[in-house]
Amino acid sequence: MRSLTTSALTAAALILTALPAVAGNWYGLISAGLVHSDNNYKEAVGAVNTANNQNPVNDADNSNVTAKLAVGCRVNDHFAVEAAAWWFGKSEQDHAGIQAGQPVNSHAEFKGYGLAVDAVGILPVTDALSVFGKAGVALIRIDGKNNASEPQYSFSKSKTRLAPKLGAGAEWLMTERLSLRLEYEHFFNAGKESRDGQTFIMPDVDYDTVTVGLKMNF
């Protein structure tokens, strides 16, 4: 995974360096959809909660709304480069139980943001329809916060990581300037598990997104 990150980062740097000199068709994109945060917080904290407390409750809501704003350049019929700002929504984790006859509980939230750069390979199917694949890298920040009835388990932390990413989708040209886009994107290792003593702070995180967007050709 380290070599994949290094390769993706190198490619991103080359893309960004070349962008000002690229002659092509520029466009903007705004998209929204659903994101799933694939993380291990519920399993890790839930195991401790179940082992130490009576009547344990371990709930997680790892799906939310996502959105991105992007700008890109269509270099030719088969290649484009894109840069995007992302909002990954938030995942929420609730744990509760009874300890020594007293209720204990915690509520954790993890919010994600990111900046991404992609190289996009395009395959026209018809004059109006094309499919594409993309690969790139994203700089992702996750803000984590836990409010717990036992103060030693409360925290507020932020972590930033470089995450390789892959995606695929389809695009339909509705008018000369306006297109409709559907795409799936996966962000690898957006978050890395970390602890502060015995307190579990940051989970391992991958993001999966499915979005629908409008692309405007400039």
Question: Where on the chain are the PLM-derived regions?
Answer:
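Short, conserved structural micro-motifs that define repeat-unit consensus positions
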Residues: 68-74, 165-169, 179-181
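Flexible, solvent-exposed coil segments and beta strand-coil junctions
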Residues: 46-52, 95-102, 143-151, 188-194
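Gram-negative (and chloroplast) outer-membrane scaffold detector with strong preference
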Residues: 24-27, 32-40, 67-148, 172, ...
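Long, hydrophobic/aromatic N-terminal blocks
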Residues: 31-66
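Cleavable N-terminal export/targeting peptides
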Residues: 1-26
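K/E-rich alpha-helical interaction surfaces of small helical-bundle regulatory domains
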Residues: 171, 175, 180-189, 193, ...
